[in-house]
Amino acid sequence: MSNYYRRAHASSGSYRQPQEQPQYSRSGHYQYSNGHSHQQYSSQYNQRRRYNHNDGTRRRYNDDRPHSSNNASTRQYYATNNSQSGPYVNKKSDISSRRGMSQSRYSNSNVHNTLASSSGSLPTESALLLQQRPPSVLRYNTDNLKSKFHYFDPIKGEFFNKDKMLSWKATDKEFSETGYYVVKELQDGQFKFKIKHRHPEIKASDPRNENGIMTSGKVATHRKCRNSLILLPRISYDRYSLGPPPSCEIVVYPAQDSTTTNIQDISIKNYFKKYGEISHFEAFNDPNSALPLHVYLIKYASSDGKINDAAKAAFSAVRKHESSGCFIMGFKFEVILNKHSILNNIISKFVEINVKKLQKLQENLKKAKEKEAENEKAKELQGKDITLPKEPKVDTLSHSSGSEKRIPYDLLGVVNNRPVLHVSKIFVAKHRFCVEDFKYKLRGYRCAKFIDHPTGIYIIFNDIAHAQTCSNAESGNLTIMSRSRRIPILIKFHLILPRFQNRTRFNKSSSSSNSTNVPIKYESKEEFIEATAKQILKDLEKTLHVDIKKRLIGPTVFDALDHANFPELLAKRELKEKEKRQQIASKIAEDELKRKEEAKRDFDLFGLYGGYAKSNKRNLKRHNSLALDHTSLKRKKLSNGIKPMAHLLNEETDSKETTPLNDEGITRVSKEHDEEDENMTSSSSEEEEEEAPDKKFKSESEPTTPESDHLHGIKPLVPDQNGSSDVLDASSMYKPTATEIPEPVYPPEEYDLKYSQTLSSMDLQNAIKDEEDMLILKQLLSTYTPTVTPETSAALEYKIWQSRRKVLEEEKASDWQIELNGTLFDSELQPGSSFKAEGFRKIADKLKINYLPHRRRVHQPLNTVNIHNERNEYTPELCQREESSNKEPSDSVPQEVSSSRDNRASNRRFQQDIEAQKAAIGTESELLSLNQLNKRKKPVMFARSAIHNWGLYALDSIAAKEMIIEYVGERIRQPVAEMREKRYLKNGIGSSYLFRVDENTVIDATKKGGIARFINHCCDPNCTAKIIKVGGRRRIVIYALRDIAASEELTYDYKFEREKDDEERLPCLCGAPNCKGFLN
């Protein structure tokens, strides 16, 4: 049916049921019973009209209905439709009528739309339903509207007032009959459009040619070039939609270039679960072999029951992997929608591929058997001239399979021509077997080695008889519990016999010397002697070649290349070296001269006071090549047996490093390294200035022009050669510096104004260094006019003497306090009254350093640990006493120093022995568990700390990035840790040692733990805490951030979260230069 007929009657509230039903034709168009197609009707009468309604609105309809008066069938068609009653059936309803049922738009009942042809009648039930519908009424079919407007009569197929409507030519005589055209003319400097009468003799021209658009034959357009068709927008499917619902299923299958052998079904399901809710998941197997095809059907559903959500999830899954494919667990899959029985086609395709592979394998096996039979027949015909060594009896099945399977090339050296039992990797991966399972099950056989290879598990035997015995007894009888299916699985072994076991004396292999070779058997004594003679001759020939090269060819070649034989070349070489040395010497002289000139230029008037802009900076260049040689010599000094700690750490796995017994090595390396750094450091600004071009000198203009100087009588400045030498010879303290801010000659002094806010006379005298300071002081005091009386002037000298004496007494008292107590006494600790009157009060931790020696932070680490044979460098008497008491005879044997690498190697061997014993026992037990971190920890000890309570100290020197100790404690869950923390606070335990490992695990070392819990916090720590995995469990390990000397306290940053309440913040007592003041 036409669009116009459907839309024109939509506003009337009811429809007419057409008697003729459209049917599908082969061309894809609707076909009516009278023989006319819908396309013919719409193509002949496709006109647009506008209609005015009474309410003033305007609507546009498509006039696709046939209204020609000449077509009798058309008039009969509309007359028939007008006489019938019932709902109108559009294209969608027409399609639904062929299915037998369509849903009514006016009731919840289903209406049969199976209509008869034009000459037939409707069914009884349908006629009864259609009679209940009200008759259709044309809204605009009134005389009042017909006389005013130009409407179309859909029943008669004619226009109202057709004869009364006139053209615009007949009504308006002012307009030209030939029409008008618009031109663009230049007027008043601007282009304007004008309308002109059109004459028939004027030929029309394409305006695009005037702008040069069509000169090349192609139309210039701004449309985007599309290389492919654009998909139409998806239309939501509802209850009024016709046709099948959108597909909610996807099919996942392996790509052609991917071999999918080891992937679980749950991995596929979990991957596609992110696109929507999966209601059905199915994996398909090969019906012939029951092996998985890795073809999956996934159906999406919606919790709300909306089919559009499920279809959208399936569509997004396909759209995501449409171009690049889907990669799951390293395997590539293709994803498509399940339409038009595509699932069955894919399954049949993969089944056919498997059948072809099986046929090919059978053909290869048949050919191998035929070839083997032919070889046996040929041997029988040749007779028994050569007798082969006897082999153990092998079953036909295992022997034939052994001849087909070969050892991988990378395992030839390890196998070394020995018998092997093989288990396929596909079978092992499917059931998640491991090498330890086979080791435990076959512990009663003489297996040489177990290898886990990408192609499977290989079990190597030293003797064929042992391999055959194991294969016959265990193949098909051995069962191992599957980790994927949770049931015992029968294991079938594949015996691979050695390939070269006949007439082979030496097996070429790259294996280690401890691998066992298969003994070679000879049939007769003559064969053995002949093979031995050949090998001896081969060895003698090889030795002879080496001897000739060393004794004859080598000396002859070296004698021919002697320098004395080529005097001309030597002369040329010496001449070149001499010229090179001269060039270097001249270059050094030029550089030295330039450096002096630049130094003189820096001290002239404009160099010192010419501004601080970057454009005025001169490029500082290093012209001395000797300095480079000097730095290179400094670097070579480090290679003479002493290297920095960083290099020692890098060589940890390559060479043996000895653990330093004292910190001399560290200090020696650090001193040389510091000297090298002082010589080799250069600022970034200098490097930028070196790269800057020398054109800046040319661009700089003279500060003053000679014309102006001559007019004003100013003499030109001439650099004084003698004056510059005086400046250079001056002390470095008084040399001027070209800086943005003037720098003082003397360093600034800080005065203690704690007890008094005024400076004493001694401080004032010490502050005045030279005459310039005295002049400045006079200028400052000139503004102050004191009232001087005879009494004050007479007592002035006495007051100066009194203040001077007070300062000296205070300095003397402070010196006594430092000498006796080690620090100054704080005035806050001085009691204002008697001790009994003051009572008990809490003293802050920062004040305890005045009377507790172990709470003081000094530059050298406080030695609170009593170490045997320890020497204090700061007490020479003690050093002499210990040296005299600890003297040993000169002929004593030097103590052997063990390296850290040897210790790690022995620990690894010990760990391997324990693992072997655990594998032999076969049961998981904690009796043989070994903590590897206990073997690698450094010697440490706890003692009283200068920071807080107890601390941890290093007994030996520790290099940077080395492990120190493990933080050991009781492993508890997070809720238990929170409960214990509250209990500790309630019981009065101020310090709780809770260390978080992850979100769910906390280590509590409060009551059960090691000495690592005594490590204190510091804002500038020398250690750090790391969480590593050892034996499958997370552990907290303390590592060194820098080189740590012996007897130095170990600290690390607690990294507490910032507390919002200031009262709950804990003060930090680390005393570091960058101390934050609080722990949290």
From Swiss-Prot:
Its EC number is 2.1.1.354. One of its GO terms (cellular component) is chromosome, telomeric region. It comes from the Eukaryota. Residues 938-1055 form the SET domain. The modification Phosphoserine is found at residue 625. Disruption phenotype: Abolishes cellular H3K4 mono-, di- and trimethylation. Increases the frequency of Ty1 retrotransposition. Residues 230-569 are annotated as: Binds RNA. It catalyses: L-lysyl(4)-[histone H3] + 3 S-adenosyl-L-methionine = N(6),N(6),N(6)-trimethyl-L-lysyl(4)-[histone H3] + 3 S-adenosyl-L-homocysteine + 3 H(+); N(6)-methyl-L-lysyl(4)-[histone H3] + S-adenosyl-L-methionine = N(6),N(6)-dimethyl-L-lysyl(4)-[histone H3] + S-adenosyl-L-homocysteine + H(+); N(6),N(6)-dimethyl-L-lysyl(4)-[histone H3] + S-adenosyl-L-methionine = N(6),N(6),N(6)-trimethyl-L-lysyl(4)-[histone H3] + S-adenosyl-L-homocysteine + H(+). Residues 674-692 have a biased composition (Acidic residues). This is Histone-lysine N-methyltransferase, H3 lysine-4 specific. It comes from Saccharomyces cerevisiae (strain ATCC 204508 / S288c) (Baker's yeast).
